[in-house]
Amino acid sequence: MIETDKLQAPRVISAQTADRQEDVVERALRPKRLAEYVGQAKIREQLEIFIQAAKNRHEALDHVLLFGPPGLGKTTLAHIVAAEMGVNLRQTSGPVLERAGDLAALLTNLEPHDVLFIDEIHRLSPVVEEILYPALEDFQIDIMIGEGPAARSVKLDLPPFTLVGATTRAGMLTNPLRDRFGIVARLEFYTPHELAYIVGRSAGLLDVAIDDAGAVEIARRARGTPRIANRLLRRVRDYAQVKADGDITAPVADAALLMLDVDHLGLDLMDRKLLGAMLEKFGGGPVGLDNLAAAIGESSDTIEDVLEPYLIQQGYLQRTPRGRIASASIWQHFGLAFPRRAGDESAELFSAP
């Protein structure tokens, strides 16, 4: 039987933003400049060129859209863009901007070339989005003054600014909004080598002794995500200080991560609950998203946005027109025999010695 207890505990390998105290620590570990930024080499190279060109012309950088799974550095890049441009950054999120006046207040307080960062930009309301279009294109907004028959529209000029939008669901952006971004970048999962470097850098900032093997052990279980790598590092640090001599080695990291229920594939209890339900209740699939969500008691959005991206990227899970299918490697990971299905050629392939 696949274990599914203790599933209500917070996920230590979740890439979602942590509580306020954890968020303060995460901000302290963020790189401040492109030269310090590790990974996403192509995006980093592009931004270096675009930023330098904008500075040479004494112009605001073109609007930037960053998308990809959570925890890969979209917010960090927004702060870096502002720092490299030498301007202020104003930060908000799509759900916070409920009314057109909320956005108008932000825009009218911007200084020339400032960066406005909107996280979860796909969640902007249609009313707010309509106000944003002329602001992005013409650096102007239309506001209504008065009510009833006496109401009139007034056009306000805005200073040139850069909008940096971040989203985990680029497909939910409307075409008119997406088309107004001059720079569009997708952030990819990090390699274990890149994450090991990030873990080593963060350990130095936290004044924690760690060897290369310990950094690699944490990195390979961090699901390709820097936010998770830094979170695991802090928990392994706690374990090392209490259960060991304070230094993080590979055996110490392994023991700490197993205590946290993070296995050698980087899967935690939530992942194993999802995959276990697919294997035990649906024979490995195909299974529809709604059925899977009902089986494990999670929302479809949580499965799509939080659980699936890494599992699909690693080949543990497949999306097909008929539904989700668990890969042969996951059957093996759970110690179960891969089923032979009639007419399934892959069963012959995976059952071969």
UniProtKB/Swiss-Prot annotation:
**Enzyme Commission numbers on file:** 3.6.4.-
Report the record's Gene Ontology biological process terms: DNA recombination; DNA repair
What are the boundaries of the region Small ATPAse domain (RuvB-S)? 191-261
UniProt keywords, alphabetically: ATP-binding, Cytoplasm, DNA damage, DNA recombination, DNA repair, DNA-binding, Hydrolase, Nucleotide-binding
Please tell me where DNA binds in this chain. R319, R324
The reaction(s) catalysed by this protein are: ATP + H2O = ADP + phosphate + H(+)
Q: Where does ATP bind?
A: L29, R30, G71, K74, T75, T76, E137, D138, F139, R180, Y190, R227
Q: Does the keyword Nucleotide-binding apply?
A: yes
* Chain intervals for the UniProt region annotation (Large ATPase domain (RuvB-L)): 4-190
Question: What does the subunit comment say?
Answer: Homohexamer. Forms an RuvA(8)-RuvB(12)-Holliday junction (HJ) complex. HJ DNA is sandwiched between 2 RuvA tetramers; dsDNA enters through RuvA and exits via RuvB. An RuvB hexamer assembles on each DNA strand where it exits the tetramer. Each RuvB hexamer is contacted by two RuvA subunits (via domain III) on 2 adjacent RuvB subunits; this complex drives branch migration. In the full resolvosome a probable DNA-RuvA(4)-RuvB(12)-RuvC(2) complex forms which resolves the HJ.
Cited NCBIfam families? PRK00080.1, ruvB
Give the domain section of the comments.
Has 3 domains, the large (RuvB-L) and small ATPase (RuvB-S) domains and the C-terminal head (RuvB-H) domain. The head domain binds DNA, while the ATPase domains jointly bind ATP, ADP or are empty depending on the state of the subunit in the translocation cycle. During a single DNA translocation step the structure of each domain remains the same, but their relative positions change.
Role summary:
The RuvA-RuvB-RuvC complex processes Holliday junction (HJ) DNA during genetic recombination and DNA repair, while the RuvA-RuvB complex plays an important role in the rescue of blocked DNA replication forks via replication fork reversal (RFR). RuvA specifically binds to HJ cruciform DNA, conferring on it an open structure. The RuvB hexamer acts as an ATP-dependent pump, pulling dsDNA into and through the RuvAB complex. RuvB forms 2 homohexamers on either side of HJ DNA bound by 1 or 2 RuvA tetramers; 4 subunits per hexamer contact DNA at a time.
- What is the name attached to this protein's record? Holliday junction branch migration complex subunit RuvB
**What species does this protein belong to?**
Aromatoleum aromaticum (strain DSM 19018 / LMG 30748 / EbN1) (Azoarcus sp. (strain EbN1))
The primary gene name is ruvB
